[in-house]
Amino acid sequence: MNKNFKLIYTDPVLSVSTTKDYCELNCKHCNKKYLKSMYDIDDERLIETLKVKKKSTVLISGGSLKDGSVPFYKQMKNIEKIKNNGYLLNVHTGFLPTQHFHYLTFFDSISIDIVGDQIILREVYNLDVDISNLKDNILKIDEFLNNAKSKNPLLSDKIPKIVPHITIGILNGMDSYEEKAIDFISKLNIDKVVFNFLIPTKGTFYAKAKNVEIKRLSEIINYARSTLPGKKIYIGCMRPFGKSRVELDFACFDLSVDAIVNPSKDFVVQIKKLYQGDFSKDDNFIESKEGCCSLI
């Protein structure tokens, strides 16, 4: 077991779309389903909603354009309003045109989905973009942020870092070139990597996808640990529910990941029994946190 293991709960986080339910890609794992559950950034009652729901963090997301970008940069006025009201901001960027890089320092965290092969872009995201161009864009974002830290050493702690996300099994539950994605991440200046899992979702092309096998999960996590030494490994909030979630949580715990987001109740019950209801025992320590995992 990891001696600094965390359970992270996203109760204080509100997901906001900068494009309503509009998306030009209609990705096979989403098909706009997840956009419809997000709050609209143009909603005049958004700040009031954040206060009433006692949120502390906002995930700025939305649908993608044909170039793979999430056009949050068209909504900076509304984003500034949220920030000025004291909320932490995590942003999904996707591909980001260089003329908009300067907006990145406004955020507290930058989440970018990393894929390992052109096949994923074409088959899952319906994205007609060369993966080498996409990777080059991410490397340039990383370089921009590193330069911003160097130029502003007194403010370096306020300059965000990229938090790469990999969705295990995103290719209809099959092997999805996760190792190649991890290899690319090794080139970035990061503190952690977040692993999500494909959720077979009704109304999407992958509604009947099989869940990842534990053996395959072990291969990926162990490869990440050896390829990204010293970097934290988080299990993100995007995971199947029910029995599958419980099995994944226990498997990830056994693999000594650093954190699990929104753990299943059965998993927490068993862990509490193991540690006699006290989340500190011997040299091990299990810490419970609230917020967006990209910021913890």
Can you name each region flagged by the protein language model?
Residues E123-I162, L217-S218, R225, K231-K232, ...:
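P-loop/Walker A phosphate-binding loop and immediately adjacent motor/lid segment at beta-alpha junctions
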Residues G68-S69, I120, N172, G203, ...:
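Glycine/Thr-rich phosphate-binding loops of Rossmann-like dinucleotide-binding domains
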Residues K33-L35, G63-L65, G94-L96, V115-D117, ...:
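Active-site beta-loop-alpha junctions enriched in small/polar residues
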Residues I141-S176, F195-K210, K232-K243:
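Conserved strand-turn element in the central/C-terminal portion of the radical SAM core barrel
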